[in-house]
UniProtKB/Swiss-Prot annotation:
Residues 7-110 form the Longin domain. This is Vesicle-associated membrane protein 7. It is a single-pass type IV membrane protein. It comes from the Eukaryota. Component of the SNARE complex composed of STX4, SNAP23 and VAMP7 that binds SYT7 during lysosomal exocytosis. Component of the SNARE complex composed of STX7, STX8, VAMP7 and VTI1B that is required for heterotypic fusion of late endosomes with lysosomes. May interact with STX17. Interacts with PICALM. Interacts with RAB21. Residues 125-185 form the v-SNARE coiled-coil homology domain. It is found in: Cytoplasmic vesicle, Secretory vesicle membrane; Golgi apparatus, trans-Golgi network membrane; Late endosome membrane; Lysosome membrane. Its main location: membrane. It comes from Bos taurus (Bovine).
């Protein structure tokens, strides 16, 4: 399983985000962010088959969405790493930044860390201290009901095939570029062979025609 979505926000103002796959993440995230108090806190919300983990510090919320069987320790390791990198990079600028002001830069950081913490299953066993384990025990898990603006019950809808489609497009593009490169390589090789053949024929025929200017073979 993987971390499906990550976002950094100030209250309900999203500053940066990244999604591992397709889904109505923003619609659901807006509902979650509206329920998070502004004081420093750590909490996990449970909704259906998904968990919403967050750390709120200095009014900045670091939140990620995972499957319900994804280890919470790994999720909070991810959030702590994101928090550290975000604070180091932006500091107090985040307190007055406009929506998505950091997205162009920080979304790539979210993507890299999301991939890293999703794939390294042994990460929490190697890096966690006992203090981190004890801290995790103090982070509550609460069930949460989400309601859309229409008043309907809001469910998190995820399309993991979008990630597969992106991978397929990347593979096709790479294959196309490789084929084009091979074609150019073969064309260059063919041209070189033709040039060498012409030079070789010229050298062989020149003595028979009286020299390099072919005086005996070319009519004046």
């Amino acid at each position: 399983m993987a971390i499906l979505f990550a976002v950094v926000a100030r209250g309900t103002t999203i500053l940066a985000k990244h999604a591992w796959c397709g889904g109505n993440f923003l619609e659901v995230t807006e509902q979650i962010l509206a329920k998070i108090p502004s004081e420093n806190n750590k909490l996990t919300y449970s909704h259906g088959n998904y968990l919403f983990h967050y750390i709120c510090q200095d009014r900045i919320v670091y939140l990620c969405i995972t499957d319900d069987d994804f280890e919470r320790s790994r999720a909070f390791n991810f959030l702590n790493e994101i928090k550290k990198r975000f604070q180091t990079t932006y500091g107090s600028r985040a307190q007055t930044a406009l929506p998505y002001a950091m997205n162009s830069e920080f979304s790539s950081v979210l993507a890299a860390q999301l991939k890293h913490h999703s794939e390294n299953k042994g990460l929490d066993k190697v890096m966690e201290t006992q203090a981190q384990v004890d801290e995790l025990k103090g982070i509550m898990v609460r069930n949460i009901d989400l309601v859309a603006q229409r008043g309907e019950r809001l469910e998190l809808l995820i399309d993991k095939t979008e990630n597969l489609v992106d991978s397929s497009v990347t593979f096709k593009t790479t294959s196309r570029n490789l084929a084009r490169a091979m074609c150019m390589k073969n064309l260059k090789l063919t041209i070189i062979i033709i040039i060498i053949s012409v030079v070789f024929i010229y050298i062989i025929v020149s003595p028979l025609c009286g020299g390099f200017t072919w005086p005996n073979c070319v009519k004046k």
